[in-house]
Amino acid sequence: MISIDFINETDLKVKEWEDLAKQIINSGFKYLKLKNKINLSITFLDSEPAQKINQEYRNHSYIPDVTSFPIEMSPQEIKALGYQEIGDIFICIEEAERKSIKYDHSLKEEMGFLFTHGFLHLMGYDHETNEKDEEEMFFIQDEILKINKINYTIKFTEEDYKEIEEKDE
């Protein structure tokens, strides 16, 4: 069982994205064969607060499309609560829209990717540690997206990395 707390700090209507997030996270839960009940929050933010969070907690000055903050719990804590709190995902829809245009994806494909990517980070997967972990995370990410009939190809280029680095200087 999954419980998702949605927080909308934008002026946008997000019901469609809440429904997509539920669908993605439910399929991820099944794909990973999770046993514990889980709870997480998803907050929709505008560009400025998303950038502030990225600056404060990750020391990056660019506007992120997704930022995840996992919570680690001991088996004793999970047993006492009766569920596992896995963390918080912050989504900047404005940045997702910008990237969907830049990389020629629909906004639904982009949002599906962001929910999947954020969820996997909450579950402990990390693509920034080493190549093996990156391959594992991206394989699972692709499988969850396929289950949800979302065709998404990462199109991030070296130029994008340079652009991000320049914004951080």
UniProtKB/Swiss-Prot annotation:
One of its GO terms (biological process) is rRNA processing. Pfam families: YbeY (PF02130). Binds 1 zinc ion. InterPro entries: MetalPrtase_cat_dom_sf_prd, YbeY, YbeY_CS. Single strand-specific metallo-endoribonuclease involved in late-stage 70S ribosome quality control and in maturation of the 3' terminus of the 16S rRNA. GO terms for cellular component: cytoplasm. This is Endoribonuclease YbeY. Its cofactor is Zn(2+). Keywords: Cytoplasm, Endonuclease, Hydrolase, Metal-binding, Nuclease, Ribosome biogenesis, rRNA processing, Zinc. It comes from the Bacteria. Its EC number is 3.1.-.-. It comes from Mesoplasma florum (strain ATCC 33453 / NBRC 100688 / NCTC 11704 / L1). GO terms for molecular function: metalloendopeptidase activity; RNA endonuclease activity; zinc ion binding. The keyword Metal-binding applies. It is found in: Cytoplasm. Its main location: cytoplasm. Zn(2+) binds at residues 117, 121, 127. It is an enzyme of class 3 (hydrolase). Belongs to the endoribonuclease YbeY family.
